[in-house]
Structure formats: structure tokens, C-alpha cells
Amino acid sequence: MKELDHRDLIEEAEPLAPGLIHEIRHPLMGILAGLELLARRIPAVSSTQEWQLLNEQAARIDELLRTYQDLFAGGPVERLPFPVDQTVRRAVSLLSPRIRKLGARFSLEAGPAPAVAVGAAPLLVHAITNLLANALDAVEERGTPGGRVQVRVLRPPGRVQVRVSDEGTGIAEAIRPHLFQPRFTTKPPGKGTGLGLHLARTAIERSGGELHLVDAEDPARASWARTEFAISLPSSGGAQR
């Protein structure tokens, strides 16, 4: 039998992804239905933090799987005005168990006024959670006490930006040109597929935006950041549908 390395396995499995996603959603629908039935039979349970967490995370898995289905299908994406601040907070909340461990070393800066962009909110959630999970991984991997992670919402003219910065391991110059290539990963086998950044950029581009690694010379970059990514979307004021 042909021996496959980790990258070969990912490449061979990729065409099966839409079918696998479909199969995973079947038992997930059963979990969501069971949670709803439990809340109906025992109304008090739906007010507990444990039930709310289970329901929210199961719904998030379903949303994530549907997002992946849409990405693999390659069909048109409806672009509508949506509140970026609210969407960013949703993405952050999905990683709250990991973020809580950072305490004051994590910060979210959304600005004084609501920012409204044009695009697909679920795709932005997908991209932010990917970037934020990578940032948390980098800080944990570095292991230096005091490593920070920050999410900011900026408003350059005609755009809305979401920036994810971290004080983790950093990214070597030699690998930066390959970051968004499919199946490229710096993580050990079993820790990463090499599809995360590729799919995050694909999601943002299909939403009408851009995703890039921020240069050290960028004046808006966090001065302490070892790595910073920026998502840019048209603002609702000057965007074209």
C-alpha cells in the first residue's frame, strides 16, 4: 500500500469534504433537536449556563459546517450591510474558554461608534475565529509570560478593518509568501491541515474583502505585535453590491 504523509492525506481527503460535512451534520441536527426537546420538557434547564453553552456551541458547529459547505460549493455569496462590532464579538465569544485564560492579556477594541460593512457576516466570523485561534496557539507555543492577543476594529476611509494581533512566536520571512497556500502549515502533524488561512482568505474574498499579513512598517500596526493580520471590507457608505 502506498504510504502517505500528512500533506498527501489532506490532499486525498479534500474531494470528500463536502460529503463528510453533510454526514457530520446529520448527528449534529439530532443533538440540536435533543437540546430543544430537553428545554421543552424541563423549561428551567434552558436558563442554565451549561445548557446555553452546549446549545450555542452546537449551533456554532452547524454554522461552521454550513460555511464550509458554501465555500466548497463555490456558489454566489449574498453581500449585505451588517454590524461588524457585533460580528466580531460573536467570533470572540466562540473562543471565550481559551481567551479567559489570558485575562487582561486579551483586549477587544471596537471603537466608540458602530461600524457597518457590506459582506457576509458568517464568513467574517469564520475568518476571525481562524485568525484568533492561530494567535492563541502562537502565544501558547511561545510560552513567554505576558504574551498578548488583541482584536481591533478600525475605520479607514471607505473601509472597515478587523485586525488580529499577537505576541506569539512570529512568522519567519521565508514562509510568509506561502502562508495562504492550501495545505501549507508550520504546525506538526495532527495539529493543522494547512487549510485554515487559505479558507479564511477565500471566505473574505468571496465576501468582497481582503485578508493579508500586516507589514512591520504599517503605521496602524500594534507596536508590540509579533504577528498581525488585517481583514478589510467595504463600509456600507461607499460599497458596491
Regions found by a protein language model. Name each.
Residues T48-R98:
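Conserved DHp (HisKA) dimerization/phosphotransfer helix of two-component histidine kinases, i.e.
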Residues G146-G158:
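Short beta-strand/loop element within the Bergerat-fold HATPase_c
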Residues M1-L20, L32:
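Conserved HAMP-HisKA connector
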Residues R100, R105-A115:
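Conserved catalytic submotifs in the C-terminal HATPase_c
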Residues I204-E205:
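Detector for a conserved hydrophobic position within an alpha-helical segment of the HATPase_c
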Residues I171-R183:
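Short conserved segment of the HATPase_c
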Residues D166:
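Acidic ATP/Mg2+-coordinating residue in the GHKL
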